[in-house]
Regions:
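Amphipathic cytosolic juxtamembrane alpha-helices at the membrane-cytosol interface
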Residues: 95, 108-112, 117, 180-208
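C-terminal transmembrane helix and the adjacent membrane-cytosol boundary/short C-terminal tail
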Residues: 7, 103, 169, 173, ...
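Periplasmic/extracellular loop-to-transmembrane helix junction in inner-membrane transport proteins
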Residues: 9-32, 46-88, 109, 250-264
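Interhelical loop and adjacent transmembrane-helix boundary motif
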Residues: 65-68, 72, 224-274
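Transmembrane alpha-helix signature in integral membrane proteins
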Residues: 36, 72-102, 210
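Generic hydrophobic transmembrane alpha-helix motif, especially the helices
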Residues: 121-158
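Transmembrane alpha-helices
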Residues: 89, 167-168, 190-228
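Transmembrane-helix boundary motif in ABC transporter permease subunits
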Residues: 88-120, 133, 141, 285-293
Length: 297
């Protein structure tokens, strides 16, 4: 009996020492993982900056693509990105917010709500090239829109719609139930509660999620490559039915060239794209802070 107790005590001591060893090593392993991730991103960014910094100029945004790297720019790709991303935002943001409000506040059929939530969550994980193939078959050929800006914008809108919907639904869930119940107790209708209680408090997170989804759309190349198929174009888009290209495709075009000067241009274009993404993220932070401050006051 005494030997059994001693053996259990010895096992307990060894297990306790092993747990303490793991506790002491865990911060080191976690810090190593963070360091490796940051170091990888920093090295890639340093390579891009050192390669393309001297190519940054207004000519990069104002000149058309050219076989001569000293005269080449990405004006058409830059304008094409603005057209497609702007139109997709006008489509997906209102629809995503409306869908989130319906799923969280207006839907009374639990089975339908769960079915929609499940499928929206699954759509958020679908590879972007699949959306491009669907857009090609339905919009480009099925509806006869061709390889136009509106086809690319709708494809990006459908791709980002699940992200906007999920983030907006999570924002609505953060609104305190006591505020909604208090408004209902005072005789407010569901529409009034949505307009004056839910939206003002959920809008900062909604806008943040929407801007982050749009930031993802800016850097997408696969669906636009399927829809547009153009890597070289020397004209400004003037309508939603014009042909187009975007910055990621222009970067891919330059990277695939054998000349070192074109690879330098691709690094400069990557820097422009990163600056746009950082600007969108900063805008999301500023808007969220201002709206939260306004709601608090």
């Amino acid at each position: 009996m005494a030997d059994t107790v001693l053996n259990k005590a010895a096992v307990f001591i060894r297990v306790d020492r092993f747990r303490k060893l793991l506790d002491s090593l865990a911060p080191a392993f976690l810090s190593l993982g963070v360091f490796l991730g940051v170091a990888t991103v920093a090295s890639l960014l340093a390579t891009v900056v050192s390669t393309g910094w001297h190519r940054l100029s207004w000519n990069l945004l104002t000149e058309y693509p050219s076989p001569d790297p000293n005269q080449a720019g990405m004006r058409s790709a830059f304008l094409g990105s603005l057209w497609t991303v702007g139109l997709s935002a006008l489509i997906c943001v209102p629809l995503g917010i409306a869908a989130a409000l319906y799923l969280t506040e207006w839907s009374e059929n639990k089975l339908l709500r769960r079915f929609l939530e499940f499928n929206i969550a699954n759509l958020a994980g679908v590879p972007s090239v699949v959306f491009g193939l669907v857009g090609l078959s339905v919009l480009t050929y099925g509806l006869g829109w061709g390889r136009s800006i509106i086809a690319g914008a709708f494809t990006l809108a459908v791709m980002t719609l699940p992200l906007v919907t999920v983030s907006a639904a999570e924002a609505v869930k953060t609104v305190p139930e006591a505020l909604k119940h208090g408004a209902y107790a005072l005789g407010a209708t569901k529409l009034q509660v949505t307009r004056y209680i839910i939206l003002p408090r959920a809008l900062p997170m909604m806008m943040t999620g929407a801007i982050l989804a749009i930031s993802r759309a800016i850097g997408e190349a696969a669906p636009i490559l399927v829809i547009s198929g153009l890597l070289f174009i020397r004209q400004d888009p003037s309508s939603i039915f014009d042909k187009f290209t975007v910055m990621p495709l222009q970067i891919y075009n330059w990277v695939s060239r054998p000349q070192a000067a074109f690879r330098e241009l691709s690094s400069a274009a990557i820097l422009v794209l990163l600056i746009l993404l950082l600007a969108f993220n900063a805008t999301a932070i500023v808007l969220r802070y201002r709206y939260q401050k306004r709601v608090t006051l």
